[in-house]
């Protein structure tokens, strides 16, 4: 069997060496090479002054898109905040009461305290309500574009109302 295969390959190589045109059965000339295609592509795009890839400026921002980005951002910020709070409680001298007394001794006005509490509670409430919205999506509900926008508005209203209420406590 090996001898037959060797004989066939040997004949093929001999034919290719003596007369290469007989060994190529369906010789089709290439239209263009990859290099020519690439040069034509770059010449066309550079001449038209368009960006290399879809750029952020061509997208129309929608409420669900912005809320998705904000949900990720609040998740990162809340994780970092909890981690920093835990590390500061572990490493700073004193206890909670001494830190609370320090804040009270600063004599900050009620407006500044309310604003600080609102700033702390707003990302938490947004992430919570938007997380509930994502859980509803996991059930397969509210996935049409109008429902996405409506649920986004509801999340924003609930976020503001609950943040105002919690900051007032």
Curated annotation (Swiss-Prot):
GO terms for molecular function: electron transfer activity; heme binding; metal ion binding; protein-membrane adaptor activity. It holds the Pfam family Sdh_cyt. InterPro entries: SQR/QFR_C/D, Succ_DH_cyt_bsu_CS, Succ_DH_cytb556, SuccDH_FuR_B_TM-su. Its main location: mitochondrion. Heme b binds at residue 127. GO terms for cellular component: mitochondrial inner membrane; respiratory chain complex II (succinate dehydrogenase). Detected in heart muscle (at protein level). Pathway: Carbohydrate metabolism; tricarboxylic acid cycle. The heme b is bound between the two transmembrane subunits SDHC and SDHD. Its cofactor is heme b. Residues 93-112, 167-169 are mitochondrial intermembrane. Residues 30-62, 138-144 are mitochondrial matrix. The chain crosses the membrane at residues 63-92, 113-137, 145-166. SUPFAM superfamilies: Fumarate reductase respiratory complex transmembrane subunits. The keyword Transport applies. It is a multi-pass membrane protein. Keywords: Electron transport, Heme, Iron, Membrane, Metal-binding, Mitochondrion, Mitochondrion inner membrane, Transit peptide, Transmembrane, Transmembrane helix, Transport, Tricarboxylic acid cycle. The keyword Isomerase does not apply. Residues 1-29 form a transit peptide. It is found in: Mitochondrion inner membrane. Membrane-anchoring subunit of succinate dehydrogenase (SDH) that is involved in complex II of the mitochondrial electron transport chain and is responsible for transferring electrons from succinate to ubiquinone (coenzyme Q). SDH also oxidizes malate to the non-canonical enol form of oxaloacetate, enol-oxaloacetate. Enol-oxaloacetate, which is a potent inhibitor of the succinate dehydrogenase activity, is further isomerized into keto-oxaloacetate. Component of complex II composed of four subunits: the flavoprotein (FP) SDHA, iron-sulfur protein (IP) SDHB, and a cytochrome b560 composed of SDHC and SDHD. Belongs to the cytochrome b560 family. This is Succinate dehydrogenase cytochrome b560 subunit, mitochondrial. It comes from Sus scrofa (Pig).
């Amino acid at each position: 069997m090996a001898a037959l295969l060797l004989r066939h390959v040997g004949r093929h190589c001999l034919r290719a060496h003596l007369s290469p045109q007989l060994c190529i059965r369906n010789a089709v000339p290439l239209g263009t090479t990859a290099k020519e295609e690439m040069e034509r592509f770059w010449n066309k795009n550079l001449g038209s002054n368009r960006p290399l890839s879809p750029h952020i400026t061509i997208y129309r921002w929608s409420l669900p898109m912005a809320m998705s980005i904000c949900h990720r951002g609040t998740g990162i910020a809340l994780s970092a905040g909890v981690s920093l709070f835990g590390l500061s409680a572990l490493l700073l001298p004193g206890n909670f009461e001494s830190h609370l007394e320090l804040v009270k001794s600063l004599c900050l006005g009620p407006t500044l305290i309310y604003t600080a509490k609102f700033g702390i509670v707003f990302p938490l409430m947004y992430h919570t309500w938007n997380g509930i919205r994502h859980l509803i999506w996991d059930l397969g509900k509210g996935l049409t574009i109008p429902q996405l926008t409506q649920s986004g508005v509801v999340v924003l209203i609930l976020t503001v109302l609950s943040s105002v209420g919690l900051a007032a406590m």
